């Protein structure tokens, strides 16, 4: 099924937000990234280390846990590599997604064990990796636990002690700033603008 999708990526995909020209440029970029040292395409997939380098060098992401989860949010199966179709549709949400698409994306990133919920343990783990420890803090873990409880109180709308997708979606729709409350998993707008300007079609 994926092979068919890869073939179709040469045409403009209907399920992404890029123009034909932008999509063609992203296809070229993907092919460049998947070349080996001899200049030939060794495989039509981006592996984990290649994708992490893209996230770090182009999109300025630094959190190891979040970067691995972003990879998982891009792929449609359980592989640790990204094919061309996933590259295009993933970047479509990553760079130009609607709020609803970004809510789905971020929830998938934060749901570390993919069970359909963000548990207290997952919240703690995500916040612990994303927060910078201050030298004056005696026990930063206690502060993180307190923050988890504040978030639970605010976002756990059905009061079951964890966040379902509905809890997360409803909370973010009311207060969009909660979208990345467990760590930055989308690039800043200025980074997106700098990236997209490379694909801008010159005006005559």
Give the residues covered by each predicted segment.
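EF-hand Ca2+-binding helix-loop-helix modules
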Residues: 1-75, 82-110, 120, 148, ...
